[in-house]
Amino acid sequence: MSELLSFALFLASVLIYAWKAGRNTWWFAATLTVLGLFVVLNITLFASDYFTGDGINDAVLYTLTNSLTGAGVSKYILPGIGIVLGLAAVFGALGWILRRRRHHPHHFGYSLLALLLALGSVDASPAFRQITELVKSQSRDGDPDFTAYYKEPSKTIPDPKLNLVYIYGESLERTYFDNEVFPDLTPELGALKNEGLDFSHTQQLPGTDYTIAGMVASQCGIPLFAPFEGNASASVSSFFPQNICLGDILKNSGYQNYFVQGANLRFAGKDVFLKSHGFDHLYGSEELKSVVADPHYRNDWGFYDDTVLDEAWKKFEELSRSGQRFSLFTLTVDTHHPDGFISRTCNRKKYDFDGKPNQSFSAVSCSQENIATFINKIKASPWFKDTVIVVSSDHLAMNNTAWKYLNKQDRNNLFFVIRGDKPQQETLAVKRNTMDNGATVLDILGGDNYLGLGRSSLSGQSMSEIFLNIKEKTLAWKPDIIRLWKFPKEMKEFTIDQQKNMIAFSGSHFRLPLLLRVSDKRVEPLPESEYSAPLRFQLADFAPRDNFVWVDRCYKMAQLWAPELALSTDWCVSQGQLGGQQIVQHVDKAIWKGKTAFKDTVIDMARYKGNVDTLKIVDNDIRYKADSFIFNVAGAPEEVKQFSGISRPESWGRWSNAQLGDEVKIEYKHPLPKKFDLVITAKAYGNNASRPIPVRVGNEEQALVLGNEVTTTTLHFDNPTDADTLVIVPPEPVSTNEGNILGHSPRKLGIGMVEIKVVEREG
């Protein structure tokens, strides 16, 4: 209803101004600005809904102030360009319509009416309401009834008798299981769901809408609200340290807790969360690569579901035979947006919908088959009678190729339980949410029927039943939940541990690198993650007078304030204000102690603008003083004009990447010497080893031969044509996820470059 009212007010404003208001520059500018704001808000809502499926939420608020990086971003470039072009076209058309009667006399009454209608259209728009609610949630002090509803359970289960297998299906929401809408999409897992306790109305709340947030909600009974973006939680050393979560209770009750997934455990701080709450045995892509049958059988995120669930079955067998009490949690990945992945062992590799193949539906059909196979193995084993199996989605599906079909349905998360000790077949339509999952499992295992804000759906009343406005209520509790982190409110002294790559202050510990905004009564940590902007880009968003402490590799801040450290990969500490004074200190001891020293100086806006502009320089445009190209730092020597075909810096150097260019090209500002030696320190990847690698300067070509280990080779070149470009052509680039950023498309690696130096020869 509000959408129609908002649009009607917008249309009325446009028509009244265009046909009645007449000519006046000020009224035209004011009306166009407000109407333009309406357009921007609604396009933002449309774009946000495209990515999140939930309108403008916390994730969008974070993304709007940081870079959009991570898995599948290239899939959204065209829609993004379309939105920008559409916005420009709408603004142009709007301006043209409003000025149609610019030659008529100005009418104050109609101009005022048009402006008021435009303001009303903005106020009535769902986008404005969502943003207003988000802003309020950032500034609230909390809700006084939080302590009445947040309940800590007993730390132990009195007499535990059952083992637990808990399967998180990535984005595997219950909507997929509607056989009338999606025929024969989930037959195997759907049949198992119908054999157990099926909870059909599990809604998604704010702070539970991505993987680590869904895990926290289901195990701790609280949404993941933090003083930083949730997926950046890999930088903290402990996770809700004061809270009692399901894993803590299981461990205290004698359970050995295991977690198995195909992706890297460090992503989004899953390792930190699980270790903080009772899990001592964790297996991710790094831990599994020496165990699995085929370590090269991987997708963009890690190992395929069939591999992961095979390892989970082996672990279930091993633990069951040992006779010890255990819980085994596992997380799939093949159904990750935007397209999903198809395991090679499943029979259901293709699913057509709406008359054409659909990759996301195909991935769902394949993954559910793999999960069902795993469950059926457990059911057929002699240990099933002592086991409770839980299957749940971590969150609703995000924007994938099935998303527009899902949105036509009443969407709910998946949660069902199969009991080996006491078979129960029932569909329970009680209103509930993800936070109730842990409490329900705890109740089944013989513990309390509450956990944080979660309540057992078998013997308690969910917050979703108590509060009709549960989404708004959850946001009202956000400050209370953030306070559970027990974050420090001041930073005066700090310690950096180079061996552990950690910084400690006021009782808290964080992984490096780290950026901190320090005010009188608040310390705001801004970690770096796969989905956040680099810290220097985040620092560029600081106000001129904001106090900051920035701990990072020296070369990243050297271009601003310490050019002598431009090639150093050691840790450095910078602090100050972007519009005032800044200092850079080299961390030169294993345990380095520092103090904050913020001076109340006069703000220089020219200095501020210069600092911001420098911070925003992209890596490939950075230049440093050096007589060689050093590949383990960002940028290039001052003599280099541009380069291509080279991946990002890593601790040892950089790989060539044929996804960015078939050849490595380094173009210098001036012609290379007439005679010179090219000293190359490098290694080869895969089949590029021990093969001639063409290296060209102008018309001359030399062959470079490298092994899999780093070596230094000198090639002799004559350059009679004054060529200014060096070209290296890896013969067989290999597509691989080795060393890749989690969730990014595979790189095509050829050679790994450590240093390239041009040495002029006499004569």
UniProtKB/Swiss-Prot annotation:
Q: Which residues cross the membrane?
A: 1-21, 26-46, 77-97, 108-128
What pathway, per the record?
A: Glycan metabolism; osmoregulated periplasmic glucan (OPG) biosynthesis
A GO molecular function held by the record: phosphatidylglycerol-membrane-oligosaccharide glycerophosphotransferase activity
Could you tell me the membrane topology recorded for this protein? Answer: Multi-pass membrane protein
Major subcellular location class: membrane
**Its gene?**
mdoB
Q: What is this protein called?
A: Phosphoglycerol transferase I
Q: Which SUPFAM superfamilies match?
A: Alkaline phosphatase-like
- What is the role of this chain? Transfers a phosphoglycerol residue from phosphatidylglycerol to the membrane-bound nascent glucan backbones.
Q: Kind of enzyme, top EC level?
A: transferase
Task: Tell me its family.
Answer: Belongs to the OpgB family.
